[in-house]
């Protein structure tokens, strides 16, 4: 009977280790994505502040791939605002995902601790 419990603990530890590694990778990926989205937000904010100092009749071009398209100041400003909003929403989603991942690992660790306590009580 002790061998079965030891096997169960060993299996649980193996599963926990795999889950922790997977979760750490996902959390690292989320951090990288958050960093990238933060850069997008800063770039859009900087571009908007630079555009604000320009006169309204200034010809503005937006880079699309390998070409530039003539756009109005308002169109570019709207595009930058949308990009900031989208990036902000994605950052919030990624933050929530990270919290969920961390919570799930903590719950798994708590379950293992409970198994160990139950084993010691026997």
Swiss-Prot record:
GO terms for molecular function: protein folding chaperone; unfolded protein binding. The keyword Chaperone applies. Keywords: Chaperone. It holds the Pfam family Prefoldin_2. Transmembrane segments: none annotated. One of its GO terms (cellular component) is prefoldin complex. InterPro entries: PFD_beta-like, Prefoldin. CDD domains: Prefoldin_1. Belongs to the prefoldin subunit beta family. Binds specifically to cytosolic chaperonin (c-CPN) and transfers target proteins to it. Binds to nascent polypeptide chain and promotes folding in an environment in which there are many competing pathways for nonnative proteins. Heterohexamer of two PFD-alpha type and four PFD-beta type subunits. This is Prefoldin subunit 1. The gene is pfdn1.
């Amino acid at each position: 009977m002790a061998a079965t419990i030891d096997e169960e603990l060993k299996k649980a530890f193996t599963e926990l280790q795999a889950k922790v590694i997977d979760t750490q990778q996902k959390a690292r990926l989320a951090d990288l994505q958050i960093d990238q989205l933060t850069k997008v937000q800063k770039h859009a904010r900087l571009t908007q502040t630079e555009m604000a100092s320009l006169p309204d009749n200034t010809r503005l071009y937006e880079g699309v791939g390998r070409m530039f398209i003539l756009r109005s100041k308002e169109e570019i400003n709207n595009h930058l605002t949308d990009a900031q909003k989208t990036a902000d929403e994605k950052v919030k989603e990624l933050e929530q995902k990270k919290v969920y991942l961390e919570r799930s690992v903590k719950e798994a660790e708590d379950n293992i601790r409970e198994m160990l306590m139950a084993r010691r009580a026997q």
